[in-house]
Amino acid sequence: MDSPGASGYYLTDGDINLAILKFKSDAVAGVERGKDWSGLHHFGFQVDDMAAIGERLQAAGAPKRDDVNNALLGSSMGERRHGGNVEVKYSGPDGIMVDVSESGWVGTPSFNPKV
C-alpha cells in the first residue's frame, strides 16, 4: 500500500491484521518517535461505538492524539477515508497508541466502509 502518510504492507489471516508501515513524516508517526521509529507503533481495535469507547479511553487517561489524527486526516478527522475507513488514535501505555474504528480495516471480514 502507498498512501499520503505511509507506505507498507498489510498482512492478514482473515481475523488478525498486521500493518508493516514506513511513515512519511514525523507528524503522521507522532513526533515523540518520528518517521524513522522501528517497533510497535499502535494497536487497532474494531469497536461498535467509537464515541462511547473514546469517552472511556479519555476517562482512563488516554487523550485523543489530535496531532496524529490531524496529520493523517487533515480537516476530515472522524470522517470516512481510505476506502471508507474511519479511525481515531489515542495515547496508550508506554507510548504505544490505541487506534479505534467502527468499520474495521482492509482485510478484516467485517470491513464495511459504509460508503
Q: Where are the model-predicted features located?
A:
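Generic short beta-strand segments
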Residues: 23-25, 69-70
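Core segments of cupin and vicinal oxygen chelate
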Residues: 1-24
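Vicinal oxygen chelate
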Residues: 9-12, 31-115
